[in-house]
Amino acid sequence: MEIIRSNFKSNLHKVYQAIEEADFFAIDGEFSGISDGPSVSALTNGFDTPEERYQKLKKHSMDFLLFQFGLCTFKYDYTDSKYITKSFNFYVFPKPFNRSSPDVKFVCQSSSIDFLASQGFDFNKVFRNGIPYLNQEEERQLREQYDEKRSQANGAGALSYVSPNTSKCPVTIPEDQKKFIDQVVEKIEDLLQSEENKNLDLEPCTGFQRKLIYQTLSWKYPKGIHVETLETEKKERYIVISKVDEEERKRREQQKHAKEQEELNDAVGFSRVIHAIANSGKLVIGHNMLLDVMHTVHQFYCPLPADLSEFKEMTTCVFPRLLDTKLMASTQPFKDIINNTSLAELEKRLKETPFNPPKVESAEGFPSYDTASEQLHEAGYDAYITGLCFISMANYLGSFLSPPKIHVSARSKLIEPFFNKLFLMRVMDIPYLNLEGPDLQPKRDHVLHVTFPKEWKTSDLYQLFSAFGNIQISWIDDTSAFVSLSQPEQVKIAVNTSKYAESYRIQTYAEYMGRKQEEKQIKRKWTEDSWKEADSKRLNPQCIPYTLQNHYYRNNSFTAPSTVGKRNLSPSQEEAGLEDGVSGEISDTELEQTDSCAEPLSEGRKKAKKLKRMKKELSPAGSISKNSPATLFEVPDTW
């Protein structure tokens, strides 16, 4: 179902109902770009640490706009043994709500726009009809603006609310405004004495003059009139004064308050959908979903925090349970039978033996997708096939049970090992970002950091290390790269051989990370005062954290072919007998259809700790067959 600004409000109840009924959701996003600086290959270095990858994406990807959000809900029908789906395709755009609303600035990447255009993406639906949204801080500020308006209007009997700023004595009026206010008071006196006229429209005036009018009427006419600010077609603001009794005044105020709440909800817009997903506490599925999660939190909750640990805590509070199908397909028992984990190819592979495609049907009133037509890069369709991939893989896990299970639910313990682990693209030895605890810290004692002239190419590096067999090169920038050797004992030889080189420098990974950490500490020390001020106005989602144990799997190795060239590091006879180089170890609740999330982050943390202690058994998954290894479904701790 396509949702734009004009039909968002009328279909919001359908979205809420789908979220409430669903067993799990699948999501996907389309963006205005990926990287505003480095190329994608530089943005995803093979030896990034999780912290480094987070910082890169935060710095170079968050200024783009998530402007299409796909949501597909899945509910299992036990009677007919099939899934009922409801797909939504939301077009999102930060249209300013009023003159004081945030005027969001974002960037576009030409290659991304060109690609989406080639896929038939309709940009007019984004920019002309996109659904507005506010993050939590913007929503808070807008609510304060409404409260301020009600407070200012309180004195003239316009509101039943009490303002601390209401004047209880004559207002001090500037000399240049006294004549204007006297004329207004004179008109109101005529209105009150007239038996025919009930309303008085004042001429458009400035915000300061309107404030003086409200304050003056607050003191001079505490009862008997209703004061309201309206806007002309030309966006000029003016005041309307009406003669009313107390009952009529209260009725009008209730109408006005209801209208303001409706306007506020309209401004919060699409964020209400994200709040509903978060408040449900249900499993959210995505494919290679780290960027989707970062953009969702950044746009609809609050700017991303400075460090990875706080991002993890924030994310698990917003989305208690996440599952990445790309990670799932990349680990056992799927890794050996799935060669390509891209979404389109994965969906095709999971239709073949030994997998069984799930029986799926669109709910009445919702359009159905035909996977044969491959509507890729429409967010709603991508979310739909992501959900299909999850179902097929989850059901395959059920075949290892004794007795086998055809249907594995989203609450089965079989899929727990994959919870809250997000796939890290192109990282050699850290397959995922662990949202629920410390990230993996593989030994990189076989990795070297090399700096060299910017004229060097990949072939130059292969030539330099030609004497060391198979290597893997991961570029950092134009003048540096990581080089992974096949044998750790070769590291010290390479470092010693390059001591007297003039055009390049080689150091161990441990040395490089140590110096980088020292520089970071020095920088942090110099900016310590500003760091103290950074801990304010953070996320306050109303959520139920969900904590699970970590599960790991076995080690795998990576090699790359070497290229022999003229420039090389051939060890001397003396160096060939050196000792091994020193290794360096581097360091489900009821849906609440609320329009804001008022619970502070600290409360979410308390709930997280409580749930860790009170962790309940999910739906029984059955017993594992004796013939299958105990670690069959565990996510690896090394890659």
Swiss-Prot record:
Residues where Phosphoserine occurs? S163, S167, S530, S557, S583, S587, S619, S623, S628
Give any single GO term for biological process: nuclear-transcribed mRNA poly(A) tail shortening
Cofactor entry: Mg(2+)
In this chain, the stretch annotated as Disordered covers 560-639
Outcome recorded upon mutating D28A: Loss of function but does not abolish ability to bind RNA. Induces a decrease in degradation of mRNAs containing AREs
Where is the site Interaction with poly(A)? K326
Q: Which residues bind a divalent metal cation?
A: D28, E30, D292, D382
Where does tissue-level expression of this protein occur?
A: Ubiquitous.
Q: Which residues carry this modification: Phosphothreonine?
A: T631
Upon changing F123A, the result is: Loss of dimerization. Loss of activity
What class does this enzyme belong to in the EC scheme? hydrolase
- List its EC numbers: 3.1.13.4
What result follows from mutating D292C?
Loss of function in the presence of Mg(2+) but not in the presence of Mn(2+), Zn(2+), Co(2+) or Cd(2+)
Q: What is the effect of changing K326A?
A: Reduced affinity for poly(A). Little effect on activity
Indicate, by first and last residue, each region the UniProt record lists as having compositional bias (Basic residues): 606-615
UniProt GO molecular function: 3'-5'-RNA exonuclease activity; cation binding; metal ion binding; mRNA 3'-UTR binding; nuclease activity; poly(A)-specific ribonuclease activity; protein kinase binding; RNA binding
| Residues annotated as domain R3H | 178-245
Family, per the entry?
Answer: Belongs to the CAF1 family.
What disease is this protein tied to? Answer: Dyskeratosis congenita, autosomal recessive, 6: A form of dyskeratosis congenita, a rare multisystem disorder caused by defective telomere maintenance. It is characterized by progressive bone marrow failure, and the clinical triad of reticulated skin hyperpigmentation, nail dystrophy, and mucosal leukoplakia. Common but variable features include premature graying, aplastic anemia, low platelets, osteoporosis, pulmonary fibrosis, and liver fibrosis among others. Early mortality is often associated with bone marrow failure, infections, fatal pulmonary complications, or malignancy.
What is annotated about its quaternary structure and interactions? Answer: Homodimer. Found in a mRNA decay complex with RENT1, RENT2 and RENT3B. Interacts with KHSRP. Interacts with CELF1/CUGBP1. Interacts with ZC3HAV1 in an RNA-independent manner. Interacts with DHX36.
Q: What does this protein do?
A: 3'-exoribonuclease that has a preference for poly(A) tails of mRNAs, thereby efficiently degrading poly(A) tails. Exonucleolytic degradation of the poly(A) tail is often the first step in the decay of eukaryotic mRNAs and is also used to silence certain maternal mRNAs translationally during oocyte maturation and early embryonic development. Interacts with both the 3'-end poly(A) tail and the 5'-end cap structure during degradation, the interaction with the cap structure being required for an efficient degradation of poly(A) tails.
Instruction: Kindly provide the name given to this protein in its UniProt entry.
Output: Poly(A)-specific ribonuclease PARN
Taxonomic lineage per UniProt? Answer: Eukaryota, Metazoa, Chordata, Craniata, Vertebrata
Name of the coding gene: PARN
